[in-house]
Each structure stands twice: as C-alpha cells, then as structure tokens.
Amino acid sequence: QIEAGRRAMTRNVRRGGKTWVRIFPDKPVTLRAAETRMGSGKGNPEYWVAVVKPGRILYEMGGVAENIARKAISIAASKMPIRTQFIISG
C-alpha cells in the first residue's frame, strides 16, 4: 500500500518535484503454514508492516504547486486503509 501510494503520486506529479516516503515497514508479520499442528515454534516472517499512529506524516512533497500536490496526495490517500489528512508546513 505504501508503494502503491508512492507510485500513484509520482505518476500524477510526472516530472514536477520530489517525493519522500516518511514511513518504513519495520515490523515482521509471521504466519504458520496452513494445516500445521500446534507447537514447534513461531512461523516464518511472511511480510512486513509499518505501524502508523495518529499524527504521523506518511508522504512529503517538494517543488510542486499546492493544487497538484493536493490532487496527488489524495490519490495516494485513497490507497491507504486509514483516514488521512493533507497538511501544509512552512
């Protein structure tokens, strides 16, 4: 989802500005194989997730007009399973 949002933003901005992804998936999620008996330890890491708490900045853009950035980030936000908000700093 992070990568899908990043791709959508860069495709929308084209060669305008620069995009930064401010989150990184650093928590492994382990899964056991289907129909495995109980016991014998923990399953293997299947994929990685990023835990996002409220107030965390997900993406950052620079060198782009505000209306283009707002449109690009709203497209990226539609790919996220959480409620997001567009903020302007500086």
From Swiss-Prot:
GO terms of molecular function: rRNA binding; structural constituent of ribosome
InterPro entries given in the database record: Ribosomal_uL16, Ribosomal_uL16_bact-type, Ribosomal_uL16_CS, Ribosomal_uL16_dom, Ribosomal_uL16_sf
Organism: Oenothera ammophila (Evening primerose)
PROSITE patterns cross-referenced by the UniProt entry: RIBOSOMAL_L16_2
Self-association state and partner proteins as the record states: Part of the 50S ribosomal subunit.
One Pfam family in the UniProt entry: Ribosomal_L16
Subcellular location: Plastid, Chloroplast
Family: Belongs to the universal ribosomal protein uL16 family.
An individual GO BP term: mitochondrial translation
Keywords: Chloroplast, Plastid, Ribonucleoprotein, Ribosomal protein
Protein name: Large ribosomal subunit protein uL16c
SUPFAM superfamilies per UniProt: Ribosomal protein L16p/L10e
Keyword Phosphoprotein: no
Main location: plastid
Gene Ontology cellular component annotations, sorted alphabetically: chloroplast; mitochondrial large ribosomal subunit
Domain of life assignment: Eukaryota
CDD domains: Ribosomal_L16_L10e
Transmembrane residue ranges: none
